[in-house]
Amino acid sequence: MIKKIIFSLFLILIYTNPILAMSDCEKTKHFKEWNDCKGEMNLANGEFYSGEWKNGQRHGQGKFNYSDGSVYTGQFKGGKPYGKGQMKYADGGEYNGDFKFGIREGSGVMIWNHGGKYQGEWLNDVVHGKGIATWPDGRKYEGEYVEQKKHGKGTFVWPDGDKYSGNWVNNKFHGFGTYTHAQGHIYVGNFLAGKKHGKGTYTYVDGKVEKGIWEYDKLINP
C-alpha cells in the first residue's frame, strides 16, 4: 500500500513538473537541434546555461550564469529571460519579478546592494509606473514614476518626519500639494520645481496663517 502511494506521488511530481518530465537533450547533437529537452551549455566567454530547450533555444525553466558573475534563475522564451524570474547581480543586488526579452518589465522587487528597495512596476528595464521605494536612512516614496523619476501623484516621507503629498514633475514638487513639517507647520497649495509658488496657505503650529501668492518660497501677495 505504501509503495503504491509513493509511486502515485512520484507520477504526480513527474507530470506536474515539466522540467522533471522532460528528457535530457542528446549531447551528440548540436544545441540548435535540441527541442523539448533539458540540457547544459558552456559558452566560450565562461557563461553557462542549464535548463529547458525548445527549437534550439533556451525556453522554459532554466538557470543562466553570466560572465560578470550575475545569475538568472527562472523562465526563458526565445533564448532570453521572459516571464517570472530572479536575477542576482554580481554587485550584490537582487531582482525578483517579471522579465520580457531579457529585461525587467512588468511587476517586480529590486533590492540594491546599498540597501535601497523598490517594489512596483517596470518598463524597458527601469522603474516606471506605480511603486514604493525605501532607503536605508528611512526615506520612503509611494506613488508614480516615469522613467525612474518621481512624476505624477506621490507621497514622500523623510526620516525627520517631514512629509510631502501631491504632484511631482521630474523628481520635484510641482503642481498642487501638501507639505507637512515634523514640527506641525503645514503648507497647502501650489509648487513649482520644488518651491512654494502660486496660491497657497501656510499654517504654523501656533495657529498663525500666511495665505496668498507665493513666489519661489516667499509670500509676495498676502
What are these regions (language model features)?
Residues 5-14:
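Sec-dependent N-terminal signal peptides
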Residues 15-222:
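Glycine/tyrosine- and acidic-biased, solvent-exposed loop/turn segments at the edges of beta-strands
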Residues 1-2:
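N-terminal secretory signal peptides that target proteins for export/translocation
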